[in-house]
């Protein structure tokens, strides 16, 4: 996966951040056609945080219940109509289970960031994701608020019917080291 992303993805490999799940999809001939890397959610994202409706304390306690799609790549030889949205929909249906098996806790919401100057987000729309707003053109390394990066559309997909209940549940005294489940 690393070499495929390094060679064919416009952002390169970069390596996953924190907890992560990687999906490599093969065609009927056994060739890799799609690469997906899911990782830890963005620490702060105003459109996502408003959509969820959580407080800063709830975000701190429950951010581990959100997965970020860090890379999504359809390889050049995998150009098949509707392949990207089909694979994306199937991958998100199994993401919570894969995360639970690997890390012992679920994820209830998926997020991704799409550069608006490069992509329209059609694949996400076709896979039932919701665009909830745009970033401000800053990055997590921008502590001084001077770094300019491309503005991105924020796309979200609930992975569980009760995702808001899981993310917004009242904090418990014992929750400092963990997160509730639905």
Model regions: which residues?
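Acyl-donor binding region in acyl/amide transferases
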Residues: 1-163, 169
């Amino acid at each position: 996966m690393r070499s495929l992303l390094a060679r064919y993805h416009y952002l390169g490999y970069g390596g996953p951040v924190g907890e992560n799940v990687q999906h490599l999809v093969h065609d009927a001939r056994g060739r890799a056609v799609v690469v997906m890397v899911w990782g830890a959610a963005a620490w702060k994202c105003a459109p996502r945080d408003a959509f969820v409706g959580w407080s800063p304390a709830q975000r701190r306690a429950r951010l581990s219940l959100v997965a970020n799609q860090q890379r999504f790549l359809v390889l050049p030889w995998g150009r098949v109509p509707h392949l990207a949205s089909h694979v994306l929909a199937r991958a998100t249906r199994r993401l919570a289970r894969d995360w639970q098996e690997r890390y012992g806790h679920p994820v209830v919401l998926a997020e991704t960031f799409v550069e608006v100057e490069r992509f329209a987000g059609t694949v996400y729309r076709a896979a039932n994701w919701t665009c909830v707003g745009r970033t401000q053109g800053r990055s997590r390394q921008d502590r001084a608020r001077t770094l300019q990066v491309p503005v991105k559309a924020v796309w979200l997909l609930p992975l569980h019917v009760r995702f808001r209940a899981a993310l917004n549940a009242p904090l418990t005294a014992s929750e400092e080291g963990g997160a509730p489940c639905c």
